[in-house]
Amino acid sequence: MEKLFEWVINHDEISVLCCPSFKVINTIKKLDIKVHNINYDINYRDMPNVICNDFVFDNVRLKECVLHYNCEKTYPVGKMHTGIFILRGDDKEHNGDCNPIRSIDKLVEDNNIKKVFESFTARIKNYNHYYVYGTNI
């Protein structure tokens, strides 16, 4: 997880998509980075500092750098937005995962990443988490 924050600190402002962990959001804020916390889950609609919109279907303006924390749950953001991406997806295959992630290559291909700055895989709780930092510009 530290690597994720190493990537985030390269940016002054970031759109964070589908991150259920307020610990992650608050850590990014403590790094003095402006966070646009966007989550489509209606359970977050009354929470302060959460933009409760679906970035796929609603008119949501994303920042140049986008951290998508649950790529397996949505349409690939890189097919709709041009910029710098920090992408995380896992192969746990939860009910409702419409975009299963089984490799770094899948994240790269789905999001039209032209240049990968860094990537890694972490095994946590008997399944893999895939991370990519790159751009489709």
Predicted regions: what they are:
Residues 21-22, 38-46, 74, 90:
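Short, polar loop motifs at secondary-structure junctions
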